[in-house]
């Protein structure tokens, strides 16, 4: 006798069940949220020269802003927020996170000094830390094992969609900003 766990395959009738339309709709909303998440993360790299000029900061500060100010707080809060996603309402948690990072992104636009921009980017990191733990858990609930990897891959496409869109949006912002404030 062994203590190995035997995994039973899904019954044939369960394996052939279609995924509810709501699951696909919800996945598309999650992809949109993840896309916005990465637009927000990447757009600062396009705006770097203008931020340096407007706030009088150097490359070291921008490195701190992109790395430490955002990433440390994203990582620090990701673990407890992931645990909270396991025990609380995941959609509500993601909504609160999206609200926080959206507010902090808007607050970034009003920053008149490096300290204010740093606080805003920390807030963005904390808010964005709610997204993936909540999304992975929700996707696991909404999609059966036979299609879950596909659903997760679709969700992950938001990284690349957001990264690409951020370049276009950032370029438009820089052009318009420089025309308005030569």
Predicted regions and their residues:
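Membrane-interface helix termini in secondary transporters
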Residues: 50, 79-83, 172
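Helix-breaking motifs and short loop linkers at transmembrane-helix boundaries and internal kinks
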Residues: 56, 89, 110-116, 127, ...
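Extracellular/periplasmic helix-loop-helix junction of adjacent transmembrane segments
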Residues: 47-76
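Helix-loop-helix hairpin linking two adjacent transmembrane segments in secondary transporters
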Residues: 155, 159-182
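Residue-level signature of mid-helix packing/kink "hotspots" within the transmembrane helices
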Residues: 42, 70-79, 129, 163-164
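Conserved MFS/SLC helix-loop-helix module at the cytosolic interface between two early adjacent transmembrane helices
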Residues: 76-115
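Cytosolic juxtamembrane N-terminal segment immediately preceding the first transmembrane helix
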Residues: 2-39
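Cytoplasmic helix-loop-helix junction between adjacent transmembrane helices
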Residues: 120-158
């Amino acid at each position: 006798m062994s203590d190995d766990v035997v995994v039973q395959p899904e019954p044939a009738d369960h394996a052939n069940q279609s995924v509810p339309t709501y699951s696909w709709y919800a996945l598309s909303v999650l992809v949109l949220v993840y896309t916005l998440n990465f637009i927000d993360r990447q757009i600062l790299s396009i705006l770097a020269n203008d931020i340096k000029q407007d706030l009088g900061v150097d490359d070291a500060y921008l490195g701190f802003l992109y790395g430490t100010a955002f990433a440390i707080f994203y990582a620090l809060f990701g673990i407890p927020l992931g645990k909270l996603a396991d025990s609380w309402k995941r959609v509500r948690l993601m909504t609160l996170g999206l609200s926080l990072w959206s507010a902090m992104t808007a607050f970034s636009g009003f920053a008149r000094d490096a300290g204010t921009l740093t606080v805003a980017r920390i807030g963005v990191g904390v808010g964005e830390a709610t997204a993936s733990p909540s999304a992975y858990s929700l996707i696991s609930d909404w999609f059966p094992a036979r299609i879950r990897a596909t659903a997760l891959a679709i969700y992950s496409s938001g990284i690349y969609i957001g990264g690409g869109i951020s370049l276009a949006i950032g370029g438009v912002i820089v052009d318009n900003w420089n025309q308005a404030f030569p």
